[in-house]
Amino acid sequence: MNIFKKTIFSVLFSLLIIGNVNADKIKIGTEGAYPPWNSKDASGKLIGFEVELAYTLCRYIGQQCEIVEQDWDGMIPALIMRKFDAVMAGMSITAERQKAINFSQGYADEVASLAVMKGSDLEGMDTPEGINLTLGGSGVKKTLKTLTGALAGKTVCTQTATIHQNFLESGDVGKINLRTYITQDEVNLDLASGRCDVALAAAVAFTDSVSYTHLTLPTKRIV
């Protein structure tokens, strides 16, 4: 059994337990504003990888499911208040979140990216891939020193209540002007309009626009 199958089994098992508690219907919360994980089409219908995966898993365990739209910054409070039974919304597993809610085994990985507009003075910044910020060591220190120097005084934008915000507020990248937004779309719009010098998000959050230049740094490195 490969890792992906083990992961999906873990998610299925979690939903099966929920289904036994709430036999009528399993309600799953998602943001609907974080493509390609979850978003909405022109008609307002929820779509995306996690929406499709949720319905597939529910069919597999023979349960009826309803996908519930929820603003990102209220996702965990809404889960705690039992507005829905589970969350599938591109949520990273962190120690802080585990104090409030339980997680199944993760079902996907993503990398984070610093993005700037083409022509930015940050475009050629050296940010090597594969640096694990949780391990420490000279490689990490060198990378953080590079980031600290390059981002000093810059306006850095990210979505609120994310691991990206936590990283930027940790002090590891020195003194920056941090701006946070309710949705990723707002981050992208302000980056494109010049109100942000650089943005930090999952790399896939920037792939819809050819105007962005990626300065890659894996998400799992900055939890």
Please name every model-derived segment.
Residues M1-F9:
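Bacterial N-terminal signal peptides that target proteins for export
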Residues S10-L16:
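Bacterial N-terminal signal peptides
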Residues I18-A23:
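Sec/Tat signal peptide C-region and signal peptidase I cleavage site
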Residues D24-M91, K99, T180-Y181:
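Extracytoplasmic small-molecule ligand-binding "clamshell" domains
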Residues E31-A33, Q70-D73, M91-I93, A108, ...:
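Solvent-exposed coil/turn segments that connect beta secondary-structure elements
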Residues Y55-Y60, V68-E69, D73-V87, A100-N102, ...:
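Short helices/loops that flank or line small-molecule/ion binding pockets
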Residues S92, K99, F103-V156, A161:
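A conserved helix-loop-strand patch within extracytoplasmic ligand-binding domains
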Residues T213-T219:
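Conserved small/polar residues in nucleotide/adenosyl-binding loops
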